[in-house]
Amino acid sequence: MRIDNTSVFFPAEEGGPTALLPDIEEGVTAFHFSIQLDERFPLNYDHEYQIVFIETSDGSHVFGVQLGSPFTNPPGPLPAPNAHSFKVLDHSLNVLFSAPSSPRSWHNFAVLVDWDNLTLKVYYSKDGAPLKPVTGTIPNLSVSPGGPGKGEFHFGILKLPLVDPNDSPSDQGDVVHHGIQEGSTEGLFYSGVFVEKVTKGVSTGYGKTIRP
């Protein structure tokens, strides 16, 4: 999957989108995905990249996976110290788990979401290794219970801009309409993306499961 200068957003008033969403966000579900860096089209780690997330109706994320330097206004030193690490975030943007990215390696994740008890748990492995839990069960209590706390499962490359010093102070925090975007072609590889309803165990690979 790649992003370049043709990856633009259209204002919401230009159309009224409709979509059919699967009813998967109930009970306990595990969101599985594997990601590999694209060395031909490297990311610019001065930027923040939101690469997997569940977006609720208010624009917040039940959980998210981030690469690059978190957007701040005013900006700090770039790239940030953890810019080259995958970071799994909760709804309040706390980092639950991080893993250094490495070229030519597949980074495998499963994020377990308990929709009733509002908790998260992260599983991770590299390449062909089976998934293992890398966190305990963590409260995610800032997310709204019920329907408002559910949303759309996204995987892709959402690149936030850098602050443009020529913008007005009020515009410098508007990441949708303002900021610096170089327009270079950048990419990631995705594989093994699926959602699993968890009753007795979480799939870890090779037909095996582990108790949640």
Model regions: which residues?
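Short, aromatic/His-centered strand-loop micro-motif at the edge of beta-sheets
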Residues: 87-108
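Repetitive beta-architecture junctions, highlighting loop-to-beta-strand starts
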Residues: 81-86, 118-120
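Surface-exposed loop/edge segments in extracytoplasmic proteins
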Residues: 60-63, 94-98, 129-136
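Low-complexity, Ser/Thr/Pro/Gly-rich disordered linker/stalk regions
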Residues: 1-81, 90, 139-212
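Localized edge beta-strand/strand-to-loop motifs within extracellular or lumenal beta-rich domains
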Residues: 102-121, 127-128
